[in-house]
């Protein structure tokens, strides 16, 4: 049985509006699960399918990986399936799977929704489909029964770390993504999140914290369950509910995956984790689950062992392939952490979530363990060791008042003075599986001060990018719709490349000189091709 996995992540209504060069870990993990189970498998980016629908006919089953924000892209794929009269099975997975009732109710062409992690249920589901047996015994699957009633066989499962490590993700990226050399490939190193704090609020849309504080001070295992049924983690984040406590993959499995991705053309690899500094911390509390966001301290030995093993790969050591990490929690940053990250990753970006400048609000309302002072300290240490900090902020969050926004304005000033390279400002969007899933963004009431924050962030980002004017940087080129985009080798703002017209250099590495900037993008003059 031939099975196609379609990567529709971050395609929104059918096209990308940002992060054009990102390949998430999930679809490659899923394709690996299917291939390792003995099925003939292909993985294709959304764009390769939407433009050549006839390829769908050769597959017995199609699995579409998507997020809640990708419903438009999913709808387009389902319309395509109908148009070509496709007769096989349609399975939907990824973060969007937690909306399985809506998916199955509104999309009769979907046969099954795989809820949550795929390692355990997916091979069983495919085996049942192949043999024509009833799928009722397969865990974490949603479907319509003969009467049309929507059923789920069980809640979603959290895959043990040893099973995650045993799976070999898909690495044949040249078959799956156009211009495959230009992307940042996310390699999963930690699944799940250690923040099992919860919002300490009551009387707000079903949130009724009883102030037991088990989630903050109790036994690590007991923190997984809330007497008031409040989902774990920051109120706006679905990771703890969907993917459970942090579990680390083995060093050998990570290094093997990176080595093979490089053989197949990868030039940039992100060590993917909700928090990279959770890597190996789960081993410090084993057999308990890692459900405390800040204690114990980072497992320095494991982090260095991982990074040193990766940098033993010749292409990484010679900097022909670049390695990045993304998100970290500021409460875990200390001198040892900054030293180790600087030793291996100097010159690269690193992302820190803060959300607002009000520490009390962050803790009690958001369920976030990070103080403003944590972030200031982390920024100073990381910059001192050669990292380039980015900081996340949010607006429209529930119960955020004028005081919260005033403090956020002051915090932006401080972050600017500390030399934060970029501040990323997000609008709050309620997601399924979060404490705030039934709350709407609160923007109109505070629109004036929110606009001040937007302008201040925009000004900061513009001033920061002005330092790039006149600099010559290495970029990977992507030709699209008559234009060239450049993605900096060491990460940074997308470059609109001028002075190069022939499409034959797409996928090549080039040298460009930055000559103008905007808050989100920069413009660069093409100088020469460095490698193809």
Model-derived features: where do they sit?
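Conserved SAM/AdoMet-binding glycine-rich loop
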Residues: 1-6, 91, 251, 255-389, ...
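Glycine-rich beta-alpha loop elements in corrinoid/cobalamin-binding modules
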Residues: 40-158, 475, 489, 512-514
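Radical SAM enzyme [4Fe-4S]-AdoMet core and its adjacent flexible, acidic
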Residues: 283-307, 413-474
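N-terminal intrinsically disordered, low-complexity, charge/repeat-rich segments that act as generic
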Residues: 364-443
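Catalytic cores of alpha/beta
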Residues: 102-108, 336-341, 399-414
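N-terminal pre-triad scaffold of radical SAM enzymes
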Residues: 10-13, 20, 171-241, 255, ...
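Terminal RNA-binding accessory module
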Residues: 443-532
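Glycine- and acidic-residue-enriched helix-capping/strand-helix junction motifs
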Residues: 14-27, 294-303
């Amino acid at each position: 049985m031939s099975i196609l996995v379609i990567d529709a992540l971050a395609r929104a209504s059918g096209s990308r509006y940002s992060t054009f060069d990102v390949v998430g870990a999930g679809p490659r993990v899923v394709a690996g699960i299917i291939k390792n189970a003995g099925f003939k498998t292909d993985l294709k980016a959304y764009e390769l399918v939407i433009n050549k629908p006839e390829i769908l006919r050769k597959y017995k089953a199609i699995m579409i990986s998507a997020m809640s924000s990708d419903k438009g892209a999913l709808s387009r794929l389902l319309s395509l399936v109908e148009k070509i009269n496709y007769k096989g099975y349609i399975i939907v997975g990824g973060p969007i799977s937690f909306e399985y009732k809506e998916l199955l109710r509104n999309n009769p062409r979907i046969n099954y929704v795989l809820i949550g992690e795929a390692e355990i249920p997916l091979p069983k589901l495919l085996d049942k489909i192949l043999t024509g047996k009833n799928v009722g015994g397969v865990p974490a699957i949603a479907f319509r029964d003969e009467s049309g009633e929507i059923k789920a066989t069980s809640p979603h499962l959290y895959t043990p770390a040893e099973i995650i490590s045993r799976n070999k993700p898909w690495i044949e990226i040249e078959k799956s993504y156009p211009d495959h050399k230009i992307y940042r490939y996310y390699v999963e190193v930690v699944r799940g999140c250690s923040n099992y704090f919860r919002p300490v609020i009551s009387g707000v849309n079903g949130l009724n914290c009883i102030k037991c504080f088990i989630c903050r001070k109790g036994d690590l295992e007991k923190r997984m369950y809330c007497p008031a049924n409040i989902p774990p983690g920051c109120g706006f984040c679905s990771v703890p509910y969907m993917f459970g406590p942090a579990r680390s993959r083995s060093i050998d499995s990570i290094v093997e995956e990176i080595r093979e991705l490089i053989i197949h053309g990868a030039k940039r690899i992100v060590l993917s984790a909700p928090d990279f500094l959770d890597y190996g911390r789960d081993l410090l509390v084993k057999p308990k689950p890692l459900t405390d966001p800040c204690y114990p301290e980072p497992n320095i030995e494991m982090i260095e062992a991982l990074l040193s093993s990766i940098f033993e790969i010749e292409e990484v050591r010679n900097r022909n392939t670049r390695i990045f990490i993304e998100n970290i929690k500021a409460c875990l940053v200390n001198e040892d952490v900054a030293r180790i990250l600087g030793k291996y990753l100097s010159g690269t970006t690193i992302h820190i979530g803060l959300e607002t400048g009000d520490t009390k609000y962050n803790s009690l309302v958001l369920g976030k363990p990070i103080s403003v002072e944590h972030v200031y300290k982390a920024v100073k240490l990381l910059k001192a060791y050669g990292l380039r900090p980015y900081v996340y902020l949010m607006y429209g969050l529930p119960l955020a008042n004028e005081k919260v926004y005033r403090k956020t304005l002051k915090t932006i000033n401080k972050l600017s003075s500390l030399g934060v390279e970029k501040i990323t400002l997000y609008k709050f969007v309620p997601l399924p599986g979060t404490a705030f899933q039934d709350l709407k963004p609160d923007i109109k009431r505070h629109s004036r001060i929110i606009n001040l924050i937007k302008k201040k962030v925009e000004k900061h980002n513009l001033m920061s990018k002005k330092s790039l004017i006149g600099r010559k940087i290495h970029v990977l080129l992507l030709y699209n719709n008559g234009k060239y985009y450049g993605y900096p080798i060491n990460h940074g703002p997308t470059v609109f490349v001028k002075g190069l017209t022939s499409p034959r250099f797409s996928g090549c590495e080039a040298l460009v000189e930055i000559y103008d900037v905007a808050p989100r993008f920069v413009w660069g003059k093409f100088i020469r091709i460095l490698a193809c």
